[in-house]
A protein has these predicted regions:
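Conserved beta-propeller blade repeats
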Residues: 35-49, 84-102, 122, 129-144, ...
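A short loop-to-beta-strand structural motif that recurs across blades of beta-propeller domains
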Residues: 66-68, 111-113, 188-190, 252-254, ...
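Cap/lid segment of the alpha/beta-hydrolase catalytic domain
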Residues: 241, 293, 404-527, 534-535, ...
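Predominantly five- to eight-bladed beta-propeller fold
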Residues: 64-65, 146-208, 236-239, 243-252, ...
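Active-site-proximal cap/loop segments of hydrolase catalytic domains
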Residues: 474-475, 482-678
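Beta-strand-rich domains and repeat architectures in extracellular enzymes and scaffolds
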Residues: 29-65
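Short, solvent-exposed loop/turn segments at conserved positions within beta-propeller repeat blades
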Residues: 59-65, 105-110, 181-185, 244-251, ...
């Protein structure tokens, strides 16, 4: 039987962020000025850390990522690049003497580059026709996998060469677009020789195949791995196209022999996502695996190959794993996963399957690398603090190594974050995060916001977001409460799975329970409570708008689903709606699906809408089409309800450009303040 043994106890249930001087106001401009720390890489000798810092430029409406190097103790941090474009995918090689990275060449095409560890002697070493999206050096550093795109299918100009200026698309099958781009090109892994100064003899591992690897939209180099002998590689692929691709999550791990081109399916017969291979120095292969085809939010298990046998190491672990890496001695697999409203670091003893927590507190951890045998490097953030680099040893408190965001964050007010347990209608206790404004006075009354999470199965952990930033909401005078309602990971598979086929069921009861619970707090102004959310959170807002019974004074929905029938017929990931809604709207004998379209469809309750609503969308959102938002806005205005729509022609499911982000935040608080601070 597995168990969790916390080696580090959180010192208190509430964390306070306090500025040393008079508090500054946390404005959208300040939020969008913060440097964004990511991708800490430990040098081979364990003495240095390489990391990136992306800095937005509000005036130019873009951002630029530069590379930094510091000692393993956080001292002597030096910026080693200062360029017009972003350096990405930076890794050490030649024992830490050099760094390889991706950067555009003089033609603007992203390529692989190398430089000395101090940033000098930059040289472009690849000559790909199209942008490279990432690369992985082999263990002997004599080969490299490069990810670039290849043409997908036949273009209109292929069919009609004389119509060179037509922009019409001829579409015969699914999935013709995905998330925020049309499927005109797909990624392939190319393997080639590398002598330290030039990449040659590149070969497309999937030459002639219309399969993608890594998998869109989230997949990167974590879906590629080398075997220790540098003679074989592993890639992740869902070898399906068209409709079969659109309804399936059945990916596999494939081992590819470079010399012969022979390919072996390592996960044959495993039906869900098989992903993110982690190979130990001796060649042990572990990976993340989901059980069910079509269920993208299934429990992510850790599997390991034992000869030809596939072993589930997490059969007794009831939580979904996000990230894995081997310890240097191969006795442990370290992993990060949602757990009770946070994202701690755990390790599993491979021999006896026992699990222990090695880094926790009210934080989320992001990535993990070893510096020697027992020192680990990671990034950490929370609702109150942006990402920074930390080091820790098992049994010791993490040590902060970078302070990129401190000059701004140290000027802000004393926002508090508390964990509150709220009873639900079915007798459970629901973990809810509550953020209190600066200079909080329990004797005063505050407007409040119910934060509705998206996903629908994404954790309400201690995330730091540059879009849905809960701290800036609290800094603007709101008590923010974020429930881990039914359907969120981190509380066992039963809690996570309950939402499937039941969008309007217990998860909505959980939201209403949280609202009612918070209204009983003496510091909550019960007449000025709002509900906000994006994606499934935006859907939740639409559903609550027709079923809240006067609980809320205003709503805000970003990229939410308004019409479930239309969503089924216009979205791209058909596996998603098949699993979550139960099936197609024309499948009249499918009671689960019929219940979804009958009881869970927000448009069925528009006649009950009576509350002001702000809706936001991006025209490049192919996950939840902007037409959903337009329907909701039109319905609200036709019913005489105060409403506003903010539409971004160039944005997708998220708002990413700095000036668009600032506009989003300004309209967000303008709307909330108008209706909740009267």
């Amino acid at each position: 039987m597995n168990f969790v043994k916390p080696l580090i106890m959180a010192s208190m249930m509430a964390v306070t962020a306090t500025g040393a001087h008079a508090a500054a106001k946390f404005t959208p401009e300040l939020l969008n000025s913060l440097g964004r720390v990511s991708d800490a890489q430990v040098s081979p000798d364990g003495k240095k850390v390489l990391y990136g810092v992306s800095t937005p430029n509000i005036e130019n409406n873009n951002s630029n990522r530069e590379l930094w190097v510091m000692d393993i103790n956080g001292k002597n941090a030096v910026q080693i690049t200062n360029t017009e474009k972003s350096e990405t995918n930076a890794v050490w090689f030649e024992g830490g003497k050099k760094i390889a990275f991706a950067y555009p060449n003089e033609k603007g095409v992203n390529q692989m580059w190398v430089m000395n560890a101090d940033g000098t002697d930059r040289r472009c070493v690849s000559n790909m026709e199209k942008d490279i999206e990432g690369f992985v050096l082999s263990p002997d550093e004599k080969k490299v996998i490069i990810v670039s795109t290849v043409k997908y299918g036949e273009t209109t100009q292929d069919r009609y060469p004389d119509l060179k200026k037509t922009d019409g698309r001829i579409i015969d099958d699914l999935m013709y677009r995905h998330w925020n781009e049309w499927t005109a090109e797909i990624p392939h892994p190319f393997v080639g020789e590398f002598n330290g100064s030039e990449v040659t003899a590149l070969k497309d591992v999937l030459e002639g195949a219309q399969f993608e690897s890594p998998m869109r939209p989230w997949g990167g180099v974590e879906q590629l791995a080398w075997l220790p002998d540098s003679k074989s590689l592993i890639y992740v692929c869902r070898k399906k196209t068209g409709k079969e691709y659109a309804i399936s999550t059945n990916s596999d791990l494939y081992q590819y022999d470079i010399a012969t081109g022979d390919t072996k399916n390592l996960t044959e017969g495993m039906m869900g996502y098989d992903n993110n291979p982690a190979v130990s120095k001796s060649g042990k292969i572990a990976w993340l695996s989901m059980e069910h085809d079509g269920y993208e939010a299934d429990k992510n298990r850790i599997f390991m190959l034992d000869g030809d046998k596939k072993v589930d190491l997490t059969a007794d672990w009831d939580y979904s794993v996000d990230f894995i890496t081997w310890s240097p001695d191969e006795k442990y697999i370290y992993f990060i996963c949602p757990y009770q409203g946070t994202m701690p670091i755990f390790r599993m003893n491979v021999a006896n399957r026992k699990v222990e927590q090695v880094a926790g507190g009210q934080y989320d951890y992001d990535g993990l690398q070893f510096a020697g045998k027992d020192l680990l490097i990671t990034c950490r953030h929370s609702f109150l603090e942006p990402n920074e680099v930390y080091s820790f040893k098992v049994g010791k408190e993490p040590v902060k190594l970078t302070s990129v965001t401190d000059p701004i964050m140290n000027t802000l007010g004393d926002v508090k974050c508390e964990k509150v347990m709220i009873p639900t209608t079915d007798g459970k206790m629901m973990t809810t995060w509550v953020l209190l404004p600066p200079n909080f006075d329990p004797n005063k009354k505050y407007p409040s916001l119910l934060f509705c999470e998206g996903g629908p199965q994404s954790p309400v952990s201690q995330f730091w977001s540059y879009r849905w930033n809960l701290r800036i909401m609290a800094e603007n005078g709101y008590v923010v409460f974020a429930p881990n309602r039914r359907g969120l990971p981190g509380f066992g598979t039963e809690w996570n799975a309950q939402i499937s086929g039941d969008y309007s069921g217990q998860c909505m009861k959980d939201y209403l329970s949280a609202a009612d619970f918070m209204k009983e707090k003496p510091y909550i102004d019960g007449d000025h409570m709002g509900a906000v959310g994006a994606s499934f959170g935006g859907y939740s807002v639409y559903w609550l708008a027709g079923n809240h019974q006067k609980r809320f004074a205003c709503f805000l929905s970003h990229a939410g689903i308004f019409d479930l029938r239309a969503q089924y017929c216009e979205t791209e990931e058909l596996w998603f709606v098949n699993w979550d809604l139960g099936g197609a709207p024309w499948d009249k004998n499918n009671e689960v699906a019929m219940r979804s379209y009958r009881e869970a469809d927000p448009k069925n309750y528009v006649q009950n809408w009576d509350t002001p609503i702000l809706v936001v969308t991006g025209e490049q959102d192919f996950r939840i089409s902007y037409s959903q938002t337009m329907q909701a806005f039109n319905a609200a205005r036709m019913r005489g309800i105060p409403a506003r729509m903010v539409l971004f022609p160039s944005e997708c499911h998220w708002v990413t450009k700095p000036q668009n982000s600032i506009l989003w935040q300004r309209e967000y608080f303008r709307w909330l303040d108008q209706w909740l601070k009267k």
